């Protein structure tokens, strides 16, 4: 990126544009480079929440959808949303299959540490995504046990949304 005649920053990018059938249309960089989706996958993992009517059934609004689609810093604002999702599902935070770690937000981490409390699963930056997956299981009447495993109906439904 330039500002006037000065180079302000340089960004490396790789990308592939494919047709619906999978044929490569255009490419920048190595199209077969192995990469990991990580959090970039979250919006796609949340598609069934919208397509299947999960958000309507449980009254999820923009904040719940946003946390199902993104990582969060475990600020008080974020925790209220995730706790609300779990309350609407009548599910406890220990049902989330994401490990506990300190909040990514430095002020939230400091406050938690000063309170003498330990981080819980709800503080995990992925807890909104996991709450969304539990909502998908609840909506369809699927047993939530193992919802993170590839052979579980939740993961199979997410895979189907990607096709």
Which residues does each predicted region cover?
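Beta-lactamase-like hydrolase cores
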Residues: 1-32
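N-terminal, well-ordered alpha-helical segments
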Residues: 13, 43-48, 80-84
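Proline/glycine-anchored alpha-helix kink/cap motifs
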Residues: 16, 48-49, 136
